[in-house]
């Protein structure tokens, strides 16, 4: 049941972070032949098979891939030291040939490097940043800079044989390649009728709470918050 709920959440939120307004800057959509970098800014990535499945998916879509130099490093429960994880993220942001950054997993650790990331090059050549869970830290920071990101599945959570995962993958592909997305959400007796307009922002509640009072704190004024 938990897995089903998580999969559904991924489907519904696969690109909720990027808003349907002209306020935020939208990175260029991907095209066949573009390169996606897989890296781990937080928890240790021991599951090489999961990365291989992610690579196979990218190749199926006609995309090239590059792995972070420190992707499989280990420093306690982190994917390498703070400096190593920061180096991979900075390289991906600065390399104009990298059109999207796909975080391999969440966990904990992105908040330890976020203040040291230089987004100068990213702002000149924005690219998609993809992930959920601990990657909420990146979503929040990049949103404050005025750019869209994608709250979507990651290699560690990718289970290609699960039906709900197939829906999530389809949603991710549509979002990355600029195809229209539609969502059907079941009604609930607890819903209140009404209309709301605004950018959809949010992510992992514990991460949003931990960033309160920091420069990465997400702005919810006039926004639609999803958790």
Describe the residue ranges of each PLM region.
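Conserved anion/nucleotide-ligand pocket segment
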Residues: 148-209, 213
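Short Gly/Thr/Asp-enriched flexible loops that form oxyanion-binding sites at enzyme active sites
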Residues: 107-124
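Structural motif
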Residues: 100-102, 130, 224-227
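Active-site beta-loop-alpha substructure in enzyme catalytic cores
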Residues: 205-227
């Amino acid at each position: 049941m938990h897995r089903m709920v998580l999969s559904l959440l991924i489907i519904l939120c696969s690109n909720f972070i990027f808003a349907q307004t002209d306020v935020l800057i939208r990175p260029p959509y991907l095209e066949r032949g573009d390169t996606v970098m897989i890296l781990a800014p937080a928890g240790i990535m021991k599951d090489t098979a999961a990365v291989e499945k992610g690579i196979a998916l990218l190749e199926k879509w006609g995309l090239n891939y590059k792995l972070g130099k420190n992707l499989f490093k280990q420093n306690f429960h982190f994917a390498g030291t703070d400096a190593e994880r920061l180096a991979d993220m900075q390289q991906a942001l600065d390399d104009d040939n990298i059109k999207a950054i796909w975080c391999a997993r969440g966990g904990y650790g992105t908040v330890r490097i976020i203040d040291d990331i230089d987004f100068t090059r990213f702002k000149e050549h924005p690219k998609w940043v993809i992930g959920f869970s601990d990657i909420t830290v990146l979503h929040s920071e990049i949103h404050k800079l005025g750019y869209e990101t994608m709250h979507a599945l990651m290699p560690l959570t990718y289970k290609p044989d699960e039906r709900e995962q197939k829906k999530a993958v389809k949603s991710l592909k549509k979002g990355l390649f600029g195809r229209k997305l539609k969502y059907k959400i079941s009604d609930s007796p607890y819903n209140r009728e009404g209309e709301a307009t605004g950018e959809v922002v949010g992510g992992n509640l514990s991460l949003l709470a931990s960033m309160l009072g920091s420069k990465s704190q997400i702005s919810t004024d006039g926004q639609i918050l999803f958790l």
